[in-house]
């Protein structure tokens, strides 16, 4: 399937012959597309750098050879690429900006009917049904060993609130679209990988 999609995109690229190919994230696929484009003399712009600083720094040379202009969303990525003589553009990060502007509310416990005397463990299972179904049961399975805490799940309103009833247990509460507030009041957090990890770290 992967190779089929790659071949189809290559055919479309050749047929359309754009001046610039703009790629977004998804390194496994897009670095291959970047190579195909460069071989055909098409400029390549890339938004959201592959996380090569974390898993394979030797691939910087591959990026330099295939990408004409890289737009990064993490400030330290600029410095990382500079070490290899590759200039990139910091495009900013909506999540980092939102966290910087956020101010915790004083009535979080009262508004959500939480116990102000019991520390919170925040549970961030993601925002898509598939990842929630894969992760949330596993996350809340540890609850019996932490009775002195209240587990609060960060729900999202793009899903039907009734959907979360599948995960109701004694000792588990849900709040919706209040992730930053929840994290700011939590003692610890269980987090699915992805944007939520960045939100928690910030």
Labelled PLM ranges:
Residues 176-202:
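A donor-sugar binding/catalytic signature common to diverse glycosyltransferases
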Residues 140-156:
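A conserved nucleotide-sugar
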Residues 163-178:
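Nucleotide-activated donor-binding/catalytic signature segment of Leloir-type glycosyltransferases, i.e.
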Residues 115-122, 149-150:
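Charged active-site motifs of nucleotide-sugar-dependent glycosyltransferases
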Residues 12-17, 114-117, 185:
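Glycine-rich phosphate-binding loop signature in dinucleotide/nucleotide-binding domains
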Residues 1-110, 124-135, 146, 156-158, ...:
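Active-site and donor-binding regions of nucleotide-sugar-utilizing enzymes
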């Amino acid at each position: 399937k992967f190779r089929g999609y790659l071949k189809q995109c290559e055919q479309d690229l050749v047929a359309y012959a754009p001046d610039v190919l703009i790629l977004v994230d998804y390194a496994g696929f897009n670095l291959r597309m970047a190579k195909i484009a460069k071989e055909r003399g098409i400029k390549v712009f890339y938004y959201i750098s592959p996380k090569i600083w974390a898993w394979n720094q030797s691939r910087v040379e591959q990026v330099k050879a295939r990408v004409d202009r890289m737009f990064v969303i993490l400030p330290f990525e600029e410095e990382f690429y500079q070490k290899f003589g590759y200039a990139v553009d910091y495009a900013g990060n909506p999540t980092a900006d939102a966290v910087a502007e956020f101010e915790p509310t004083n009535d979080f416990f009262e508004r959500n009917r939480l116990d102000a005397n019991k520390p919170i463990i925040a549970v961030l299972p993601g925002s898509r049904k598939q990842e929630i179904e894969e992760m949330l049961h596993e996350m809340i399975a540890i609850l019996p060993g932490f009775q002195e805490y209240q587990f609060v799940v960060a729900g999202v309103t793009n899903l039907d609130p009734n959907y979360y009833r599948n995960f109701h247990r004694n000792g588990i509460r849900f709040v919706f679209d209040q992730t930053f507030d929840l994290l700011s009041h939590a003692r610890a957090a269980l987090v699915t990988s992805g944007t939520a990890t960045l939100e928690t770290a910030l």
